[in-house]
Amino acid sequence: MYGRTSRRGGKRKMNNRKIKTELINDNFQNFKRYGIPKAQLVIADIPYNIGNNFYGSNPMWYKNGDSKNGESKLAGKAAFNSDFNFNIAEYFHFCNRLLKKEPKKAGARGRSSDAPCMIIFCAFEQIESVKNYAKKYGFKNSIPLVFIKNYSPQVLKANMRIVGATEYALVLYRDKLPKFRNGLKVDENGKNIKGTGHMIFNWFEWKRDNSKVYPKIHPAQKPVGLLKQLIEIFTDEGDIVIDPCAGSATTLRAAAELNRNSYGFEISRDFYNKAQEKMLNDINLQQTLI
């Protein structure tokens, strides 16, 4: 259906363990072909279903950001190739199959278990719909996340109304609270060490990446720094992270820098090639050298 597929990645050693980073040019629905292991965390930015209006309030709609110059090539364009045919039911079916099973035992009193979870970035208007679909596939629980920017892309509306400067996501999990790492340490008796561990609020600062380090590839690209924060909270080194809608592969880059195994799917050949060349190339070179 999607033509010839490609997969490229690399391995490197971390404490005598091999860490793998692999991006696959195929639809996530075909995951069985690739023998991918079960994930501790699935994290993805699903299409927002706003179609041709993605750049609607953004100056990028016009050449050089000025309406006097006429419309740019981005006018009337969607951010995602799948913005018109993304099947959220199939997405949750995939996630349910690829996440690890629930642990039999809950965590110690006052601590989380090692259960897996998924994080879905979505539009504010999609939150209730995403939660309802998630429940149908066994993800009964959710935690909302808010990301606060110090800028807004809606420049063209600045003198007309309040502009958007937030992004949203949901942490979805089945039954037990998912693995949670907040810096808490335990002693040899398994008791919490005072002074370790800290509260993690459900809002985060959205800090833009340094473009010289992390090039902009995809219009809806999420900052590597932010993704690293989330990955550190819900996984340990050596765990597996999967991004079914990888785009620019920033999730894979973030996971690799934190010594997590990662796999991603991207159906666009163009984004796949750019991600390999610009986002993952340094990682793959390091892995090859090691």
Model-predicted regions and their roles:
Residues E125, L280-I290:
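Class I S-adenosyl-L-methionine-dependent methyltransferase module
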